[in-house]
Amino acid sequence: MGYIITKTVSIVLISFLFTIIHYLVIIIIQSTTKSEKIDGDRFLNNIWFYLIFFLFFGLFLLLITLIVEKPAVIFTLGIFLILIVPFIQPFIPMIPNIGDDIQDSFKYIPFTYLTEKMTGEIKFSHWQWFISIASIVVLFIANMLYASKRDI
């Protein structure tokens, strides 16, 4: 159980590190282009977004790592989820009869809306907040149970 808690804490620290790097890049770009300052609310939104993004994908891939134990599968799945899914998503409505329904359901699947928000506006609906946090809790519990079952 200590292994999973340590991994989760490291994921949280990495998310804070990425937030700080992201914010520093924004400050450097703002100072070189003499644009308006970024407000503090946007910075706080970025902290929450990166925390949710890294915890969700980190805990999901950690669970897959515990189950599969093959690094190539985890690497391929990570690339697929973060790079390929957003590329394929605009083509889903072209599927006859069910494409629009699938596209509507993407608003409630963290794999799709978290990667979509990486390149767009970081605004969550109430359901997306709930689904994200609930998914993180479920993934954390699943990791704990699987790790205790394997005696890690």
Q: Where are the model-predicted features located?
A:
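Short cytosolic juxtamembrane segments of multi-pass membrane proteins
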Residues: 147-152
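Secretory targeting signals
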Residues: 4-72, 78, 86, 114-132
